[in-house]
Design a protein with these regions (language model features):
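Alpha-helix N-cap/helix-start motif at coil-to-helix transitions, marked by capping-box chemistry
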Residues: 16, 71, 91-95
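Short alpha-helix plus adjacent loop in nuclease-associated cores
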Residues: 74-91
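Short, polar/flexible loop-turn hinges at active-site or ligand-entry regions and domain interfaces
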Residues: 5-12, 61-68, 107-111
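Conserved non-catalytic scaffold segment of RNase H-like nuclease domains
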Residues: 1-51, 102, 114
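Substrate-recognition/cap helix-loop segment adjacent to the acidic, metal-dependent catalytic center
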Residues: 49-73
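Acidic, Mg2+-coordinating catalytic module of metal-dependent nucleases/exonucleases
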Residues: 40-47, 52-53, 57, 89-138
């Protein structure tokens, strides 16, 4: 899947070790005992996909306090971009990250697709295009 071989998957660290490393990183930025100090989960189609896997990781590692780290509402660029593409959606082949980025005028390097860092960069670029189209003042 996504160019990852079985051998690569088998060489990964144990799930619990990855969980401990993630919590260590989160602990640097979030006081899990302060209900107003949390992170937003941000991604592309993360609301219906990635967030569930991350929550399951916490559960499988015996951590019932996923909500101590993250706000319950996430920022899903997949959902956020939808109203901006309503006029062309019927003409789009699909709503995958690459297709949406290209439709938003973002140059794509197909050799880098499904690389985690590159996908984050594309998601960020789509988000910036969305923000550029909004007239919101906070």
């Amino acid at each position: 899947m996504a160019g990852v071989t079985l051998e690569q998957v088998q060489s990964y660290q144990p799930m619990e070790e990855g969980y401990r490393q993630l919590v260590g990183i989160l602990s640097k930025y979030v006081n899990k005992f302060d209900k107003r100090d949390k992170m937003y989960l941000v991604g592309y189609n993360n609301a219906g996909f990635d967030n569930n896997f991350l929550r399951a990781l916490f559960t499988q590692c015996g951590d019932k306090y996923f909500g101590s780290w993250f706000y319950p509402n996430c920022m899903d660029v997949y959902v956020m971009v939808t109203p901006f593409l309503m006029g062309v959606r019927n003409d789009m082949e699909n709503f995958k990250l690459m297709t949406v980025a290209r439709t938003m005028g973002i140059e794509i390097d197909e050799n880098k697709l499904h690389d985690a860092t590159y996908d984050i960069e594309l998601t960020r670029d789509i988000f910036y295009r969305i923000i550029g189209k909004m007239d919101v003042k906070l």
